[in-house]
C-alpha cells in the first residue's frame, strides 16, 4: 500500500485510536490479568487492520502503537545508557537463621519501627534485569542492568515484548520514572524456542535465563520479537531516588494498575518468621507449578520511608532488602542410558535413565530428552556427565552434557529403527521431528492410550492406575478403551493383588465414568492435536458425538478457537472405519454422547455481541462468559456500535462511558441473569405445551 501524504479522514483517525485502545486492552487482559477476552484470530485481524491504516497514513503511527512491537533492525551496536538511579543488587540469605540476622541488622538502625512496617515478599525471577524509562507515561528507553550505573540501550528489543506497556494506563503517573523488572522466558516458550533452533541447525540455549539475556542483545529486534519473552516489574524510581508510593506493597499494586505485569504469589508479612514460612511454601510447593524459573524470594521492608532511612551499605547493597535463595534447581549426574517410550499416538520419545540425584529437594532418576534431534544437537552420549534441571517443571529434563568430563567411554546414541514395544518399523512424516510407530495394536500405544483415557482431565476413573492398566493388558482383559466397560469383579479378583473390595470399587468407578460429558470423552480419545480446551470447544459447539462425527474439516475449522490442523485431525479420526466401530461399541456400553453445556442454536443471545466490564457481584469473568456463550452469544473485549449490550459491574471505567456515548444498552448482572432465566422459562413452557 502506498503511503498517503494527505491528512487522514476524521473517521480513519478515530478508527486508528479505537484499534490502539482495543489491542492495548487485549494485551493487558492477556499478559497482566491472565483473563483474555479476545481470540487470537480476532486480535490478529484488528492488528492487521491497524497496520494497514498506519501504512497508508504514517502520521497515525504513534509511539505507543501495538504495531511498534514487531521489531526493526538496530542501526548500530548498543549505546550506553545511564540509569536514573543506580540499580542495586541484594545480599543473600539461605535459611531462617540468616533472615533473623537480617532483621537484627534492621533493628540496629530503625529499632522496633520494623515491626510496624512489616515486609513484602515477592518471587525472585530468574531472568534478565531491565530498566524501563517512562516519560509522561510513554516508554522512551529500555536498558540492561550493566554495571548498575550504566547499561546498554535495548529499547528496540524490549518494545517487542507484549507484556511491556508502551504507554502506562491511567493519568496519575509521574512525569519521569524508571520501572525495573525482569525479562524472562516461560519454560514452555523456552522449549519451543530450542526446538526451532534445533530445526534450523542452530545451537540450543542452556537455560531460560541465558536465552532471555541473549534475546535482549539481538542486533535485529525482529529476532527478539519472534521469541516468547515476558516481563515482570518489581520496582519504580523517580529521578531523586524516591519511589512513587508509600510502601512496597502499594508500589506493586500501582504498577499493576498502570498495566505493568507483576509476579504472582506476593504477600504481606508482619514478621520475618512469616516471610520464611512463605519462602518454604514457595520453594517446596508453588515453585513446581509456576511455569517459569525462580531462584528464590525477595524480602523487602514494606515502608518506603524506612527504606530511605536504612539506606545502602558500603558494598552498595541495600540494607532494606534481602534475597532468600532456594536450593539449586540444577545438578550434575551420570546419564546411564537412553531409553524410548511409546506414546498413545505412536510417538517414540527418548528419556534419560540417570544415576539418582537430588535436584531442588527431589530425587531424580529419569528425565526428559524430548526428541532425537535435540539429543543430536546437544551431543548427548550414554555415560556422559549431564546437567539436570527440575525448577518449575514436574518432569525434570537434561540441559546438556559436560564434555570436559568425558573419558572416551561415552557412546553416541541413535533412535531405533524399530518400535521397542512391537518391533514394527518406525516412520517419520515429512519434516516432523517426531518418529512414530504406525501399529495401532502396539502394546505401548495401547497402554498410554488407556492411561490417557482414564486420566483426571478425561474420564477420571479413580483407581485405574498405570500399574493396574498394565496388569489388565498383560492378562488380556483389555485391548482398547471399550473393553474397560466389560470388566467384571470376578475377572479382577482372579488377578494378583486384587482384593474383592478393590475390584468392586474399580468396577463402580468405571461405571460412573459413563456419565462424563462428551467433552471429557473427546479429550480421552486421544485424538492428535486435540487438548482439553479444543475438546470442550467442539463439544459445546456441536452438542453431540454424532454431530461431531458427521462434520467436515471445513465446518470444524469454523468453530472459534479451532484451527485447520485440529479440524483436519478430528475429521480424519472420525472418518476412519475403525474409529466409527469403536464409537458404536462405546455407545452400546452406555457412554454419554452429549454435552450438557452445549451452545444453544436458538439461544436467547444467538447472534448477540456482549462486552463484560467491571467487577460483577457474584459471577467471575469466566462464569459470565460461559453463560453468554452457552446462550449463543459472543463476548468481545471492546465496545462498538455493533455491541448488542454491555454488562457492567463495579469500577466499569471507560467501556461503560463508551457504551453510553454510543447509546449501547447497559445491563447489570441481575438483568443479564433475568434475561437468561427468562429464556430458560420460555423453553420449559414450550417443552410442556
Swiss-Prot record:
Q: Where does NAD(+) bind?
A: 40-44, 89-90, 122, 145, 182, 300, 325
Annotated BRCT domain ranges read 600-689
Q: Which cofactor does it need?
A: Mg(2+); Mn(2+)
Please state the Enzyme Commission number of this protein.
6.5.1.2
- Which PROSITE patterns does the entry link to? BRCT (PS50172), DNA_LIGASE_N1 (PS01055), DNA_LIGASE_N2 (PS01056)
Q: What does this protein do?
A: DNA ligase that catalyzes the formation of phosphodiester linkages between 5'-phosphoryl and 3'-hydroxyl groups in double-stranded DNA using NAD as a coenzyme and as the energy source for the reaction. It is essential for DNA replication and repair of damaged DNA.
The similarity annotation says: Belongs to the NAD-dependent DNA ligase family. LigA subfamily.
Q: Which NCBIfam families match?
A: dnlj, PRK07956.1
Protein's UniProt name: DNA ligase
Q: Give the source species.
A: Gemmatimonas aurantiaca (strain DSM 14586 / JCM 11422 / NBRC 100505 / T-27)
Amino acid at each position: 500500500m502506498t503511503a498517503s501524504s494527505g491528512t487522514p479522514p476524521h473517521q480513519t483517525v478515530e478508527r486508528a485510536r479505537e484499534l490502539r485502545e482495543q489491542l492495548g486492552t487485549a494485551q493487558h487482559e492477556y499478559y497482566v490479568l491472565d483473563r483474555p477476552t479476545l481470540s487470537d484470530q480476532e486480535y490478529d485481524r484488528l492488528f492487521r487492520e491497524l497496520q494497514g491504516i498506519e501504512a497508508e497514513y504514517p502520521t497515525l503511527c504513534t509511539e505507543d502503537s501495538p504495531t511498534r512491537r514487531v521489531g526493526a533492525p538496530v542501526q548500530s551496536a548498543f549505546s550506553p545508557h545511564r540509569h536514573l538511579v543506580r540499580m542495586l543488587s541484594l545480599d543473600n540469605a539461605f535459611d531462617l537463621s540468616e533472615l533473623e540476622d537480617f532483621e537484627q541488622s534492621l533493628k540496629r538502625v530503625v529499632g522496633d519501627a520494623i515491626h510496624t512496617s512489616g515486609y513484602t515478599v515477592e518471587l525472585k525471577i530468574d531472568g534478565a534485569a531491565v530498566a524501563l524509562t517512562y516519560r509522561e507515561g510513554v516508554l522512551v528507553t529500555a536498558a540492561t542492568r550493566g554495571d548498575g550505573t550504566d547499561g546498554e540501550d535495548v529499547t528496540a528489543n524490549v518494545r517487542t515484548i507484549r507484556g511491556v506497556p508502551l504507554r502506562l494506563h491511567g493519568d496519575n503517573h509521574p512525569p519521569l520514572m524508571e520501572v525495573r523488572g525482569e525479562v524472562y522466558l516461560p519454560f514452555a516458550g523456552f522449549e519451543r524456542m530450542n526446538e526451532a533452533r534445533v530445526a534450523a541447525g542452530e545451537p540450543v540455549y542452556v537455560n531460560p535465563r541465558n536465552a532471555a539475556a541473549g534475546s535482549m542483545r539481538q542486533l535485529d529486534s525482529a529476532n527478539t520479537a519472534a521469541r516468547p519473552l515476558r516481563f515482570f516489574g518489581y520496582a519504580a524510581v523517580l529521578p531523586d531516588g524516591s519511589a512513587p508510593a508509600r510502601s512496597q506493597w502499594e508500589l506493586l499494586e500501582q504498577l499493576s494498575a498502570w498495566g505493568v505485569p507483576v509476579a504472582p504469589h506476593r504477600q504481606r508479612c508482619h514478621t520475618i518468621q512469616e516471610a520464611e514460612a512463605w519462602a518454604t511454601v514457595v520453594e517446596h510447593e508453588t515453585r513446581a507449578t509456576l511455569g517459569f524459573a525462580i531462584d528464590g524470594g525477595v524480602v523487602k521492608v514494606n515502608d518506603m520511608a524506612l527504606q530511605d532511612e536504612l539506606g545502602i551499605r558500603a558494598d552498595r547493597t541495600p540494607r532494606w532488602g534481602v534475597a532468600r535463595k532456594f536450593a539449586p534447581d540444577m545438578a550434575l549426574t551420570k546419564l546411564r542410558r537412553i531409553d524410548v517410550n511409546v506414546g498413545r499416538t505412536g510417538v517414540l520419545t527418548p528419556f534419560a535413565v540417570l544415576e539418582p540425584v537430588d535436584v531442588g529437594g527431589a530425587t531424580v532418576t529419569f528425565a526428559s530428552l524430548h526428541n532425537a534431534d535435540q539429543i543430536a544437537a546437544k551431543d548427548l552420549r550414554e555415560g556422559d556427565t549431564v546437567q539436570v534441571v527440575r525448577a518449575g517443571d514436574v518432569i525434570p529434563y537434561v540441559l546438556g552434557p559436560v564434555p570436559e568430563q568425558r573419558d572416551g567411554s561415552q557412546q553416541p546414541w541413535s533412535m531405533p529403527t524399530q518400535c521397542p514395544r512391537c518391533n514394527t518399523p518406525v516412520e517419520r512424516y515429512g519434516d516432523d521431528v517426531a518418529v512414530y510407530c504406525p501399529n495401532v495394536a502396539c502394546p505401548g500405544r495401547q497402554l498410554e492410550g488407556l492411561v490417557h483415557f482414564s486420566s483426571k482431565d478425561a474420564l477420571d476413573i479413580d483407581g485405574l492406575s498405570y500399574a493396574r492398566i498394565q496388569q489388565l493388558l498383560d492378562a488380556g482383559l483389555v485391548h482398547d478403551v471399550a473393553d474397560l466397560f466389560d470388566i467384571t469383579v470376578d475377572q479382577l479378583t482372579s488377578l494378583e493383588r486384587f482384593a474383592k473390595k478393590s475390584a468392586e470399587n474399580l468396577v463402580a468407578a468405571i461405571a460412573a465414568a459413563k456419565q462424563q460429558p462428551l467433552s471429557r470423552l473427546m479429550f480421552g480419545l486421544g485424538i492428535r492435536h486435540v487438548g482439553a480446551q479444543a475438546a470442550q470447544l467442539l463439544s459445546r459447539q456441536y452438542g453431540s458425538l454424532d454431530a461431531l462425527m458427521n462434520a467436515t474439516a471445513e465446518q470444524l475449522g469454523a468453530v472459534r478457537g479451532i484451527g485447520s490442523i485440529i479440524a483436519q485431525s478430528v475429521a480424519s479420526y472420525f472418518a476412519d472405519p475403525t474409529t466409527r466401530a469403536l464409537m458404536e461399541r462405546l455407545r452400546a456400553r452406555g457412554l454419554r454422547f452429549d454435552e450438557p453445556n452445549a451452545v444453544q442454536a436458538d439461544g436467547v443471545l444467538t447472534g448477540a455481541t456482549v462486552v463484560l466490564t467491571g467487577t460483577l457481584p457474584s459471577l467471575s469473568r469466566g462464569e459470565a462468559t460461559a453463560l453468554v456463550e452457552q446462550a449463543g452469544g459472543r463476548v468481545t473485549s471492546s465496545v462498538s456500535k455493533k455491541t448488542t449490550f454491555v454488562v457492567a459491574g463495579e469500577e466499569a471505567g471507560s467501556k461503560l462511558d463508551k457504551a453510553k456515548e454510543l447509546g449501547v444498552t447497559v445491563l447489570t448482572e441481575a438483568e443479564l441473569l433475568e434475561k437468561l432465566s427468562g429464556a430458560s422459562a420460555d423453553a420449559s413452557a414450550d417443552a410442556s405445551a
